[in-house]
């Protein structure tokens, strides 16, 4: 199932409540403010703080 980019208009980072960006290559939602990536499972964003992955300098 593909991620519906329309969700970006209504979802927010659960940590800072900021805007998320979709990374097509990694299939994740990215919060640049907190430097966190949230997984997307079967087209559904998993916006749980304990599932977030810290971004590395190379990302």
From Swiss-Prot:
Gene3D superfamilies per UniProt: 2.20.25.10
InterPro entries, alphabetized: Trm112-like
GO annotation, cellular component aspect: cytosol
Pfam families, sorted: Trm112p (PF03966)
Family listed: Belongs to the UPF0434 family.
HAMAP family membership: UPF0434 (MF_01187)
Name of this protein: UPF0434 protein Shew185_1670
Source organism of the structure: Shewanella baltica (strain OS185)
């Amino acid at each position: 199932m593909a991620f519906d980019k329309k969700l970006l208009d209504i979802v927010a980072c659960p940590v800072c409540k900021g805007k998320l960006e979709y990374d097509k290559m990694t299939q994740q939602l990215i919060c640049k403010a907190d430097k966190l990536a949230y997984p997307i499972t079967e087209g559904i964003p998993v916006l749980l703080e304990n599932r977030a992955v810290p971004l590395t300098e190379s990302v």
